[in-house]
Amino acid sequence: NQVVTIHAKQVIDATELGDVFADAGVPYDLGMEASTISGENVGVEKSSDIIQDLTYTAILKDYGVGQDKTIAKPAGYDPSEFDGSCTDYYIDKSRKKPSVDSKKMLDYGKLPNNKYMINWPIYGNDIYLNLVEMDEAARQTALIKAKEQTLRFVYFIQHQLGYKHFGFA
C-alpha cells in the first residue's frame, strides 16, 4: 500500500496485452504512428490504436488426398472475407494482389508430421483488435470473434481452396 513515483522518458510494457498503464489509470499512448510522425518508412499512412494483430492459430493435418475432413460451415461464412489471401482466390482486384499461391501460404506454417500451423496475416486469420481499451466483457466477445474468424478461414482453405483433406490435427 505504498505509492511509488517513477520518472522515465520511456517505459516498455512487455505484458501479454500491454495494458499495465491502462489498468493503472496512467496516461499512455499506444498503436501505430503514421510515418509522418515516426519518420519510419513502414507504409503506415494513418495513425491507429492497433498495437499488434491477434491470431488464434489452428493446427491442421494433411490426412491425404481422398479424405474429407471439412468442418461444418461456420456461421457468417463469406469467402470474400479471405479474397486475396493467395493467388488461388483473388477476385476483388481492388485488394492488394497476393504474392503467393495456396501451397506457399500453407507452407508458411508447415510443421513436421504433415501438420500446418494456420497463421496468415493477409486476408487470413489475423484480426486487428485493441484489447487494451476494452473491458473484460468486450475482450471476451472480441476473442470469440477472433476464434470464429479462424474457423471461417479453415473452412475457406478446405472449401474454396480444395484442401478438404486438411483437418484439425
Residue ranges and their predicted role:
Residues 2-169:
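Flavin (FAD/FMN)-binding glycine-rich loop and adjacent Rossmann-like elements that form
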